[in-house]
Amino acid sequence: MEDKRIVLAIILSLVVFLGWHSFAEYMGWISPKVQHVANERHSSVDQTATSNIALDSVQSVFSPPTGKDVYIETPLYIAKIHSSGGILSSFILKKYKVNLDNTSPLVNLVSPEASQAMPLGITLNGQPSWSNGNWSFLGGDLYLKPGETKELTFVGIVNGVKIIRIFTFNADSYLIHEKLQLASEKQNSCPTKVGLLVAATPFGTGQYDPTRMAWSIKDSFKEETSIDTLKEKGIQESGEFNWGGVMSNYFMNVVALSDPLYLTIKGRIQNDVWRVALERSNVLIPAEGTTSITVNWWFGPKDRELLSRAPDKLENAIDFGMFSIIAKPLLTALTFFYEYTGNWGVAIIVLTLCIKIVFWPLSQKSYNSMEQMKKLQPMMQKLREKYANDRDTLNREIMQLYKTYKVNPAGGCLPILLQIPVFIGLYQALLNSIELRHATFIYYLPFTHLVWLADLSAADPFYITPLLMGASMFLQQKLTPASGDPTQQKIMMVMPIIFTVMFLNFPAGLVIYWLFNNLLSIGQQWWMLRKA
């Protein structure tokens, strides 16, 4: 019985880990996050609204500056930058669609609404540079072929400070490198506070892919996902930052400064636009001299390979949580299997099989231990009846029973306990992998023209795999040696129902993993029963 209690505690803990957020939203304890992809939004933003970019000193109007648009096209994206201040007007990803429809538009990480918050913009002492000065640019539209890098320079005069923004674009990366030069025409040195802005409308797609504000401070990942908090209070924190911005599981708009510097991050949601600023205070511009700041911007997917080559710890933006040490090798293995199978769903099944093989000896030990515990149940029941009013003696007698028959009461649950971090690691790996976005397993439901498992990052639209998963759990429960406690038996039989309901809206890739893991476990249990 003690063995079953431990197993039950582990399972309930896993249920809480996976299902708490959904339950809390359903009960109304936290507000639901209504997310949309940027291209699907049709809300309007008041162009004369006062900026609440979280740069408290900025109280200027975010109105479109005069000037012209400059286009930059690479094999990866098409960007549009406004010549007045170097403001980003749109950033369209050429390799990613909003949805699976053939007519779907491409993902635009800077929607028309977000562009009103002036992403890629800079402020000096809280004043917007794009509307308080005269700007010109050197060059024209840029078209980059693979392997090429090209530059674009914007020059402005704002309140006696000459701003030179030299952007370098790489055809093979989403990174935009900027050399920001500030030159003073004054006779004395000028301490200046410089703000760097990013903005986005929500490009997350729901509960398992929320849009959030995130930042890296002293190489540690931090984030804020609460819409209520970001609307009412916003965020503000100072420290040695690597980068900060807006992101979902798959995409991000962030700004970074080379080398960790003491900065302040501020962010807020206003009119459904997520605005983040990194502020660097006391930037000293020497008298009649120039100071330079190295800035890196990333507007694009959270691609592990590309981010691993990016500066400023940008690879930390892919956060796998406390089980990253497990999630990363699992994702590497999954990618390896995909290269040979050409199908992410098949790759998940192969990975599941490999994990099952690794844990086969432990699972076998678990089943043996539970079978031994089952044989002891009649003797344990007699002890409970004999010492019903003497719990201390009962516990001593039960422990002596374990010792006599050489049974470890935890032997059945420890192997399960060891597998839970693997499941959570894989959960995080699948949830944060851009490779699985719109990855197909079985496009059409067999014998129909209904789109089925066309996107492993989305839920099964017909709930077929969650129902099969629940049925497999029920069958597995039937094959597992039962506890002598009727109450525990009833609870364990209810678990498949709980998991089925919980998995209805899980990404299909995770459900497939759990389903095939159950099927392999059933096969192992059947083999052991035949062997016995």
UniProtKB/Swiss-Prot annotation:
Mode of membrane association: Multi-pass membrane protein
InterPro entries on file: Membr_insert_YidC, Membr_insert_YidC_N, YidC/ALB3/OXA1/COX18, YidC/Oxa/ALB_C, YidC_ALB_C, YidC_periplasmic_sf
GO biological process, one term: protein insertion into membrane
Transmembrane region(s): 6-26, 317-337, 342-362, 411-431, 451-473, 496-516
Listed GO MF terms: membrane insertase activity
Keyword Protein transport attributed: yes
GO cellular component: plasma membrane
Principal location listed in the UniProt entry: membrane
Keyword annotations: Cell membrane, Chaperone, Membrane, Protein transport, Transmembrane, Transmembrane helix, Transport
Function: Required for the insertion and/or proper folding and/or complex formation of integral membrane proteins into the membrane. Involved in integration of membrane proteins that insert both dependently and independently of the Sec translocase complex, as well as at least some lipoproteins. Aids folding of multispanning membrane proteins.
UniProt subunit comment: Interacts with the Sec translocase complex via SecD. Specifically interacts with transmembrane segments of nascent integral membrane proteins during membrane integration.
Record-linked HAMAP family: YidC_type1
Family: Belongs to the OXA1/ALB3/YidC family. Type 1 subfamily.
Name of protein: Membrane protein insertase YidC
Gene source species: Lawsonia intracellularis (strain PHE/MN1-00)
Lineage, uppermost ranks: Bacteria, Pseudomonadati, Thermodesulfobacteriota, Desulfovibrionia, Desulfovibrionales
Gene: yidC
